[in-house]
């Protein structure tokens, strides 16, 4: 499932090709995604200029003259830039034409979306309750410490809650907690200020390093240039249950938390 680094990688890959250009056509081949694509967009978008392209959590935001297109990649979605002569594949569900280049959306499992908001996009129902960006100034050790007080849920579940902080998906939660030396099953409310400092630092580091590597490719994800991400080659714990810890050489423990794979070192993480 594309997470924050994959979405950021996509944004950086496609935006230079379309920013400032006008939409010349919107071709919707399959409107039935997680939520139906508004068919009226085919008439509304042509002629509008792409003013800005940004990311909020795992959502891509394309800002035009009269509103904002909100795109989510779902479980298996990807966006890529193609030439007009390149024929669509079976799972390519919509094309946003910008003259001689096309922003093409592919989604085999169809859990993604293309929605439209004419008003303040940050007040959209999908965005207004989101927590701070993990790479932004508002995500601080003090913030994490205060939000975690009296919380009895496991710290891994806590940092994966998008109302606490956005974009820390399962892979990156596993990796960040290992680097910070914190067991994923530790109660969030039991974190000290020093632990919060370490965890914020390592969440930032892991996400930034993944962005630099183009994201993590486990199944369907490819970046905006159609190439896979390479962060998977640097994973320390995720997907390595039973293998030797790269720090202490003891076997990594794998458990299920909220039906998600969780891997950690019982020696290095406290």
Curated annotation (Swiss-Prot):
Question: Residues that bind DNA, according to the entry?
Answer: 91, 109, 151
Q: For this protein, what is the EC number?
A: 3.2.2.23, 4.2.99.18
Alphabetically list the UniProt keywords: DNA damage, DNA repair, DNA-binding, Glycosidase, Hydrolase, Lyase, Metal-binding, Multifunctional enzyme, Zinc, Zinc-finger
Q: What would be an example GO MF term here?
A: class I DNA-(apurinic or apyrimidinic site) endonuclease activity
Q: Name one GO biological process term.
A: base-excision repair
Q: Which domain of life is it from?
A: Bacteria
What name has this protein been given in UniProt? Formamidopyrimidine-DNA glycosylase
Q: Enumerate the catalysed reactions.
A: Hydrolysis of DNA containing ring-opened 7-methylguanine residues, releasing 2,6-diamino-4-hydroxy-5-(N-methyl)formamidopyrimidine; 2'-deoxyribonucleotide-(2'-deoxyribose 5'-phosphate)-2'-deoxyribonucleotide-DNA = a 3'-end 2'-deoxyribonucleotide-(2,3-dehydro-2,3-deoxyribose 5'-phosphate)-DNA + a 5'-end 5'-phospho-2'-deoxyribonucleoside-DNA + H(+)
Of which family is this protein a member?
Belongs to the FPG family.
Give the annotated active site: 2 (schiff-base intermediate with dna), 3 (proton donor), 58 (proton donor), 260 (proton donor)
Taxonomic lineage of the native organism: Bacteria, Pseudomonadati, Pseudomonadota, Gammaproteobacteria, Cellvibrionales
ZnF (FPG-type) residues: 236-270
């Amino acid at each position: 499932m594309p997470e924050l680094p994959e979405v950021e990688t996509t944004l950086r890959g496609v935006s230079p090709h379309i920013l400032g250009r006008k939409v010349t056509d919107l071709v919707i081949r399959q409107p039935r995604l997680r939520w139906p694509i508004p068919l009226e967009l085919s008439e509304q978008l042509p002629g509008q200029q792409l003013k800005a392209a940004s990311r909020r959590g795992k959502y891509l935001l394309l800002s035009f003259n009269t509103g904002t297109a909100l795109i989510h990649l779902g479980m298996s979605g990807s966006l890529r830039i193609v030439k007009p002569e390149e024929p669509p594949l079976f799972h390519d569900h919509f094309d946003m034409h910008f003259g001689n280049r096309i922003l093409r959306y592919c989604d085999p499992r169809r859990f993604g979306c293309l929605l439209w908001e004419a008003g303040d996009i940050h007040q959209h129902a999908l965005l207004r309750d989101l927590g701070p960006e993990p790479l932004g100034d508002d995500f601080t050790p003090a913030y994490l410490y205060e939000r975690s007080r009296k919380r009895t849920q496991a710290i891994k579940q806590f940092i994966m809650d998008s109302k606490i902080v956005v974009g820390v998906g399962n892979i990156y939660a596993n990796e960040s907690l290992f680097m910070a030396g914190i067991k994923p099953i530790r109660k969030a409310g039991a974190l000290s200020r020093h632990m919060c400092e370490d965890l914020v630092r390592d969440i930032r580091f892991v996400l930034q390093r993944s962005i630099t590597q183009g994201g993590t490719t486990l199944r369907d994800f490819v970046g905006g240039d159609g190439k896979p991400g390479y962060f998977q080659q640097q994973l320390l714990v995720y997907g390595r249950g039973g293998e030797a810890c790269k720090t202490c050489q003891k076997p990594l423990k794998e458990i299920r938390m909220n039906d998600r794979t969780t891997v950690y070192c019982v020696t290095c993480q406290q």
